[in-house]
Amino acid sequence: LVSLEAKRRLQRFRKQRPLPPVPVLVVGNITVGGTGKTPLVIALVQAAVARGLKVAVVSRGFGGKTDQYPRQVTADSNALEVGDEPVLIARRTGVPVILDPDRRNALDVAIREYSPDLVISDDGLQHYALPRSAEIVVVDGQRGLGNGRCLPEGPLREPATRLKEVDFVVSTGG
């Protein structure tokens, strides 16, 4: 069932793929659990900033307790409210981090408020309403794709064939 829903959303996304007003790089995964997305997001932000680009990050803010969206995360934000990963990104990079479960809305806020040259989405691969210029999927090099099955039978959020459609696959920890 999860696999069918993922395929349906992906097909609809392909048909209606909107172009983002600025380059949007989505860093995500197709498995449940941690794969190292956030460290990669931090490294990408730092590399872009070092090249003189103005960067913003959008995120859902998984694990936070806030219900006030959109919300900007700063180095001083409370991780219990907004999630530990957005706070870590803000602390390590100093760039604006905008939280909203509706990542398209977070993107709109980031563009309107900060005029970035590049927006990086921490997660959001399956959030097809978010326009994107490129997709990077992070795979845990030790766990791989598990048994290769989609939820609830396995660890995949989408079929493994999705890896053929993304721009880059990064293997971590293996």
Region spans (language model):
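Short hydrophobic helices that act as membrane-entry/anchoring signals
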Residues: 2-10
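N-terminal, well-ordered alpha-helical segments
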Residues: 2-3, 25, 42-46, 87, ...
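Walker A (P-loop) phosphate-binding motif
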Residues: 10-75
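Phosphate/Mg2+-binding loops and adjacent switch elements
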Residues: 61-174
